[in-house]
Amino acid sequence: MITAHPAITIRRAVADDEPAIHAMVRRERLNPHHLYFRNFAVAVSGHEIVGASQIRHHRDGSRELGSVVVTPLWRGCGISARLIEFLLAGEGSVVHVITRKRHAHHYERWGFAPIPARLAPCPIRLNFRIGDTIGTIMALVQRRRVNRLMILRRTV
């Protein structure tokens, strides 16, 4: 972890950022679909992308905060919070997030609250079901604790 905090810039992603975003998302084994740079904000230190997050724009109009990722060296410095605040500042509609149950409390400060999956829009419900099923199967195969997912909603 970085203890001295050099300047971190949060900005909208540009096309040249896409390879770094894809690499970070793959490294963390996050949902690899719908990774369009136009939906992303990035955290930059010097010329290095050290964090990224996006709001997915689904065809039905629903919005999903996702792909929140920070490089290991920079974790614990508040970068993910700054990325989320940056993205949510530009959103005037309902936003959902799919997260592990044990991480849900981190989203309360932005007004996210748990909802039953049946109340989520179809694309978000589908992402939730796929992620929860794959995560459960992988945990069982690897003989580790199952970390269940949940859906949170933020209303404006």
Regions found by a protein language model. Name each.
Residues 42, 48-57, 62-69:
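Conserved beta-strand in the GNAT
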Residues 1-32, 42-44, 146-156:
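Short amphipathic alpha-helix that is part of the acyltransferase structural core
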